[in-house]
């Protein structure tokens, strides 16, 4: 479905009369606290996307037959707002998040949205909630845009009506206990996505499908699952809910986007920085056997994941079948450290953004 024509909709604002106390930014967790307000907008067949509004954070009332509850027609995004040492608030590549949201919409038969308007609306919401952007080191305001199908109907088809909403949550430092490597388990019993499916969409079903394998990995003492392709079950795709990189000899390798791998914004940022720094950066298919062989020959130097929540997640141990290998002697490697520092320095305004990635919201 095509996006509606570009026009400036007026956002109505209703402020809460019961503001919540601000949390202690030095003791934040993840995804449990929410700000005073949220953004809502509806899609109606006769009007398109309409009725944009900022209003008090509140439950969404739904008919028990609402289609999203039965068939999972929904998409979402995840990004963060950061407070700099100067007190300004900024976003990291938000336009790319909204481009990806529309890509997900196309795959889920959801009407696309005006990306410029979404950014304007987000800036207005964050400006209202700026006191909720925490100032403690490495904390941030997590942003969750979501679209759900809202027709009360039990037939299997695309909905005619939708709700777009954005909620905000102050979150603590991801590496509160230190920037340490994780242990990952390679699974051949389960797949995250298949060719021709919706693996590249950010849709709830992809995450629900990962829960069982993830739970089994945790029971075995591993942090994440390393996903292989759903056809031959030998080519690496993602790790947990992140993209993944391998450093073999002097080459940085990331699995090529193939329709079942999410278009990670942090992944794209790592690739851009690697090229800027003149590293040998390759996007291609890479098999688990190649990784194991490169470790055996002493060529596997580092493995790390990339994503919005962790930014960079170094891997210190990997289990495949009966083989358990240590990577970088179980320590954080220099590549992972450099990418993590470079990205977080840009996000928090500690270094100048020479890539054009930062959108300043307010001060």
Residue ranges with predicted function:
Residues 32-43, 54, 67, 181-228, ...:
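Active-site-adjacent loop/helix segments that line or gate small-molecule/cofactor pockets in enzymes
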Residues 24-27, 94-97, 102, 106-220, ...:
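Extended Lys/Arg-rich, glycine-bearing segments that form polyanion-binding/interaction patches
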């Amino acid at each position: 479905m095509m996006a509606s024509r570009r026009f400036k909709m007026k956002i109505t604002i209703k402020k809460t009369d019961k503001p919540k106390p601000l949390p202690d930014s030095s003791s934040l967790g993840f995804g449990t606290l929410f700000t005073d307000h949220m953004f809502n907008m509806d899609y109606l067949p006769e009007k398109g996307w309409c009725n944009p509004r900022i209003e008090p954070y509140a439950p969404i009332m739904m008919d028990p037959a609402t289609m999203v509850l039965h068939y999972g027609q929904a998409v979402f995004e995840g990004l963060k707002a950061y407070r700099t040492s100067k007190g300004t608030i900024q976003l990291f590549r938000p336009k790319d998040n909204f481009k990806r949201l529309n890509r997900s919409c196309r795959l889920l038969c959801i009407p696309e949205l005006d990306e410029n308007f979404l950014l304007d609306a987000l800036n207005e919401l964050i400006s209202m909630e700026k006191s909720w952007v925490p100032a403690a080191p490495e904390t941030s305001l997590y942003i969750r845009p979501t679209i759900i199908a809202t027709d009360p109907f039990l037939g299997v088809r695309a909905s005619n009506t939708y709700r777009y909403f954005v909620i905000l949550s102050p979150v603590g430092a991801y590496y509160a206990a230190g920037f340490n490597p994780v242990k990952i388990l390679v699974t051949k019993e389960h797949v995250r996505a298949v060719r021709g499916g919706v693996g590249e969409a950010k849709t709830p079903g992809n995450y629900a499908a990962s829960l069982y394998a993830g739970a089994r990995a945790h029971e075995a003492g591993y942090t994440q699952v390393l996903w292989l392709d759903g056809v031959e079950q030998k080519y690496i795709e993602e790790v947990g809910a992140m993209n993944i990189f391998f450093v073999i000899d002097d080459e940085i390798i990331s699995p090529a986007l193939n329709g079942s791998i999410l278009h990670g914004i942090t992944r794209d940022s790592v690739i851009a920085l690697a090229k800027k720094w003149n590293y040998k950066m390759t996007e291609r298919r890479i098999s688990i056997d190649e990784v194991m062989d490169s470790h055996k020959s002493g060529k596997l130097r580092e493995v790390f994941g990339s994503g919005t929540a962790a930014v960079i997640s170094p891997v210190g141990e990997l289990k495949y079948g009966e083989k358990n290998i240590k990577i970088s002697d179980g320590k954080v490697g220099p590549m992972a450290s450099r990418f993590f520092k470079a990205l977080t320095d840009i996000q928090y305004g500690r270094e100048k953004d020479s890539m054009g990635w930062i959108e300043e919201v307010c001060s």
